[in-house]
């Protein structure tokens, strides 16, 4: 048997953290078993669907690297198939027409609640029975699935263990509306059957749907897949995850400067574990992933942990990979990397200091863009009269360099200190402000080497002009 999983979001909003984790688990399980992963868009809610949401889901999946083997399939393109299966159940008396109006059903529900009964559809209720018997062909009706009245549905959830639901707790589900459109629970079953889905991995909010769907699988003569229901994700305060906890769309994490590999690593650990290991390569995730290692308990979303992982991956990933994802942020800032050193060299030098790609993009502009003003606080502190001579000596020495290497630039700074009998801080900080425009950067000799001789010379001259103007206005 080839394992086949699916991710089946509804296009009523963006791909959020919970959905992304479900997609990741489904993708990982398929990969770990040498199987296939299907993407299906469950767009039967015609009033709430949007193309914008479809695009956002596809973009989020692609950004996370969760490529699908089949799809995306759209349920709205399969209505003929669903109706064929509804008609099959009608012909076999496993479904029936119900003519009870919404108003009548509301009235019956109110009676049940008044009698302290569980509100549910009851085909044998005298009022509902009378409405169905009085109906004529052509009157508006829904189609209901004839749920078994006896026994119970039992299934072995791969995360939660044995689950049993009595059929007496389930009413006859509507499988086709009065407008002729099929309903969610029915479409899902037909899709999973037609697409050969063997394992359904989804959120625990679907547990109540599962016994209903199992009865429909069996009525259709379809194989019942294996189910695994994941616990919800909570905020770090124990409340259901919401926007105030940082529960934003996947692409907003892109916008905030997270790497897909970091978000995937974080999401896989929100419920699944392998000993105490925290860092997992994609290959390790695939090789180690199993459904029975997913916890039944809810997981708490911790932004600090995600940030720590992101910093780890910025520091340790192939600079080419970081550069690929940094490019979007550079484009937002109008930074063109053809105007300076190789971006991979800059990432190697600066990346370790950054928790996000936004921080990284903010810190590397001076490698590629000239500036016409220094950071006010840094200039006030370090571009003073006392820095004039050290900068002048440094300028002469860098202009005279024939080999522009980090080692030679380091020696220039050391020679300035020796020649003027000053400490490193007397030249290092003024030089840093001069060549970067600010007071923070990696080692200034390495920064100068990447910026290049022409720019370094021009910027030291600009700093000297700034000092001269400052002294003139003092």
UniProtKB/Swiss-Prot annotation:
Q: Which reaction does it catalyse?
A: tRNA(Glu) + L-glutamate + ATP = L-glutamyl-tRNA(Glu) + AMP + diphosphate
> Which positions does the motif 'HIGH' region occupy?
9-19
Q: Name one Pfam family in it.
A: Anticodon_2
Question: Where is the protein situated, by its record's location annotation?
Answer: Cytoplasm
User: Which Gene Ontology cellular-component terms appear in the entry?
Assistant: cytosol
Q: Give a GO molecular function annotation for the protein.
A: zinc ion binding
Q: Which GO terms describe its biological process?
A: glutamyl-tRNA aminoacylation
Q: Which InterPro entries would you find in this protein's record?
A: aa-tRNA-synth_I_cd-bd, aa-tRNA-synth_I_codon-bd_sub2, aa-tRNA-synth_I_CS, aa_tRNA-synth_I_cd-bd_sf, Glu-tRNA-ligase_bac/mito, Glu/Gln-tRNA-synth, Glu/Gln-tRNA-synth_Ib_cat-dom, GluQ/Sye
User: Which ranges belong to the motif 'KMSKS' region?
Assistant: 240-244
Principal subcellular localization: cytoplasm
Per its UniProt record, what NCBIfam families does this chain match?
gltX_bact
Q: Report the function annotation for this chain.
A: Catalyzes the attachment of glutamate to tRNA(Glu) in a two-step reaction: glutamate is first activated by ATP to form Glu-AMP and then transferred to the acceptor end of tRNA(Glu).
Q: How does it assemble?
A: Monomer.
The UniProt family comment states: Belongs to the class-I aminoacyl-tRNA synthetase family. Glutamate--tRNA ligase type 1 subfamily.
Please state what the protein is called. Answer: Glutamate--tRNA ligase
- Name the lineage: Bacteria, Pseudomonadati, Pseudomonadota, Gammaproteobacteria, Vibrionales
């Amino acid at each position: 048997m080839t394992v086949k999983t699916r991710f089946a979001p509804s296009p009523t909003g963006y791909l959020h953290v919970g959905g992304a984790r479900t997609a990741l688990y489904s993708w990982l399980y398929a990969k770990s078993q040498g199987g296939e992963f299907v993407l299906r868009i469950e767009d039967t809610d015609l009033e709430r669907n949007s193309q914008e949401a479809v695009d956002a889901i596809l973009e989020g999946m692609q950004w996370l690297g969760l490529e699908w083997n089949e799809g995306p399939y759209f349920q709205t393109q399969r209505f003929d198939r669903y109706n064929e299966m509804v008609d099959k159940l009608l012909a076999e008396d496993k479904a029936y027409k119900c003519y009870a109006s919404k108003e009548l059903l509301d009235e019956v529900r109110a009676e049940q609640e008044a009698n302290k009964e569980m509100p549910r559809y009851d085909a044998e209720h005298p009022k509902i029975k009378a409405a169905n018997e009085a109906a004529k062909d052509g009157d508006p009706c829904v189609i209901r699935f004839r749920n078994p009245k006896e026994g119970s549905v039992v299934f072995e959830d791969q995360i939660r263990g044995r689950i049993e639901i009595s059929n007496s707790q389930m009413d006859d589900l509507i499988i086709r509306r009065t407008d002729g459109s099929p309903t969610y629970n029915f479409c899902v079953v037909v899709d999973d059957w037609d697409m050969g889905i063997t394992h359904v991995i989804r959120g625990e909010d679907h547990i109540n749907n599962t016994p209903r769907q199992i009865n429909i699988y069996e009525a259709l003569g379809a194989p019942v897949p294996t189910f695994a229901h994941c616990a919800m994700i909570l905020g770090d305060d124990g409340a259901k995850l919401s926007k105030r906890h940082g529960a934003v769309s996947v692409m907003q994490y892109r916008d905030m400067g997270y790497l897909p590999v970091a978000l995937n690593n974080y999401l896989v650990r929100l419920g699944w574990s392998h000993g105490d290991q925290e860092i997992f390569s994609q290959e390790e995730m695939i090789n180690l992933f199993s459904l029975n290692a997913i916890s039944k308990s809810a997981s708490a979303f911790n932004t600090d942990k995600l940030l720590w992982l992101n910093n780890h991956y910025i520091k340790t990933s192939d600079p080419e990979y970081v550069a690929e994802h940094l490019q979007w942020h550079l484009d937002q800032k109008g930074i063109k990397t053809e105007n300076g050193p190789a971006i991979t060299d800059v990432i190697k030098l600066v990346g370790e200091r950054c928790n996000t790609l936004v921080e990284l993009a903010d810190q590397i502009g001076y490698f590629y863009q000239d500036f016409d003003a220094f950071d006010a606080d840094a200039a006030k502190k370090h571009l003073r009269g006392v820095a004039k001579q050290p900068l002048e000596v440094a300028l002469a020495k860098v202009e005279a360099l024939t080999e522009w290497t980090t080692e030679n630039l380091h020696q220039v700074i050391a020679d300035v200190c020796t020649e003027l009998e000053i400490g490193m801080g007397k030249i290092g900080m003024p030089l840093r402000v001069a060549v970067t425009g600010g007071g923070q950067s990696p080692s200034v000799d390495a920064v100068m080497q990447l910026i290049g001789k022409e720019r370094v010379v021009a910027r030291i001259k600009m700093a000297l002009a700034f000092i001269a103007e400052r002294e003139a206005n003092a």
